[in-house]
Amino acid sequence: MSFTSIKFRANSAPKTTTSLTLTRSRSTAAISPVFLEARARVKEHARNISRSSAHNAVVSQTVRPTPAPAFQQLPSKISPPNPAPSLPTHSDIPLDHSFVGLSGGEIFHEMMLRHDVKHIFGYPGGAILPVFDAIYDSKHFDFVLPRHEQGAGHMAEGYARVSGKPGVVLVTSGPGATNVVTPMQDALSDGVPLVVFCGQVATSAIGSDAFQEADIVGISRSCTKWNVMVKDITELPRRINEAFKIATSGRPGPVLVDLPKDVTAGILRTPLPFKVTTPGSTLDLPSNPLQTPVRASSELELIRQAAQLINQAERPLIYAGHGVLGNPLGPKFLTQLAREGNIPVTTTLQGLGVFDETDPRSLHMIGMHGSAYANLAMQQADVIIALGARFDDRVTGKVSQFAPAARTAAAQRRGGIIHFEIQPKNVNKVVDASIPILGDVTENLAAMLPLIRFSERALWFKDIKEWKEKYPFVYVKSNPEKGEKIKPQEVIEELDRQTASYKENVVITTGTMGFGLPAAVGAKVGAPNKTVIDIDGDASFSMTAMELATASQFNIGVKVLVLNNEFQGMVVQWQDLFYDHRYSHTRMTNPDFVLLAKAMGVHAIRVRSASELPEKMKEFLEYDGNKPILLECIVESNEHVFPMVPAGKALHEQILHSLLRDKKQNTEA
């Protein structure tokens, strides 16, 4: 099974707070003896790099290869080094002397303190050792060492989703950096703030195919909001500030800062303006018109038009995505809009949890594997209010046949699609919006709410009620007396039953295969007093299973629920439906997950029958919250996920569960 998800529920453990005073700028005299000793080692290391670089330049200058394109702006070995960037000399500009005499690694440490970083996820290596040496035994933040850099990236994602702070990743050059590409792409797709720092070979060796050299700036250009190589130690504080600013501005996302070894090992000799060393200061960053958010004040006329369209709508529908979760007030304002306007709500997969699923106005998830009634409602709504969603193909189905009623209403000027979006580039990218409202979704909702009027819409809710009754989520339960394996739905239902009392404190998120376990570890680090549950398929779990050892080593109390069907479930479903049951390389031969977990010091239990599920689930949930635990459920191999909208089909052309198909055929007969 390839599904991966993590689920967080609040428990009754008392919350503790730790008071920590951070010094925003430090003089040399304030540095601890550990740092003074570390600096001496770093200085000697910097001198060695300088000597080695000079020697290598003489030896190899006649055969130096052409640099890779992304590095062509760097100084070559045979050209004199670029002079240090010119700094303001006007006596009125205040200068920060606290970094003078510090190595690049020590400056990195101090900048993490100034940005109030509490946790870093990463893996050391030669090119990043000056930074790791500088943070050695630091008491100011915790470092989590995963078993693989991909794990570090996903841990930072989980941490960011729960804490609201950017996740910080620190890895070495070459393979260390490239192993974080998947988490960065995942974070870019889902709008998760990550700040990734990676080591790089010395600037004098760039372009020479040096040991573990990789053009990570070029490689990561398409999977980050912004990336940069720090070419001089005087740039380091500014680049770190820029990274945190860009990662959290507008639609959040990942950024990458490439740190050559001679920059992190070098020593700063000149003071820097406070403007570039102080977090939150104006950095005069260039703006990208396709990413720059627009404030609500510039959209007031469009907001009034949108409210008027909503008030006159007969069949409106709210389509909410992950963007609503970007602000703590987002779910509150969404609920207010739904109730005050009496409007049904459907959400994307990433938007699950943004609206109360037990509310009668909830249509649950929409799209390829969404509810049948949500898909039908989208096709018949005359006004669609899209909040923080981007109309991806899993939601729209066949675009030319998406939301036909809203398009007809738009042509008649009585309806259409209202798109609340923070990034201009996402407007009209897939579906044309009748009224695009740019800017922060929460701010714009706050401006529109006073203009919304209540309407009964009896006929609309009558249709929705009939769809819910006609097309519910269904499955056939297992029969333990016949030795049948558990259905995965039974596991999820039992989990839901035993955690129902925490309904108001649930955060659900999903990611790529391999995301679940490390993301849950990061989430638990960010919210140690919460219960964090990773719901994983066996195929997804296998990709990052070694991170159980990380949870064990650092006493991170995640709960890992593995649904083991010995198949790559989603792919197998396609092979059954569209490829004549030809299971091309989708069957898994798994290790004994219980023994594997125990080998890593993790308590593990297994369930084979539905009759023992309640007892084992109770043990799983009540296990020590400071230690990891694994529950393996052996589930039916051929259970599929329905409804399903086939690729290239419209939402109303969805495939229903066989029980509903048979019922529909009998009714028509």
Role assignments for model-derived ranges:
Residues 321-326, 480-483, 537-539:
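Conserved short loop/turn motifs at secondary-structure junctions
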Residues 205-212, 428-430, 438, 445-448, ...:
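Thiamine diphosphate
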Residues 252-255, 454-471, 505, 630:
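Flexible, glycine/charged-enriched surface loops at secondary-structure junctions
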Residues 1-42:
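N-terminal chloroplast transit peptides
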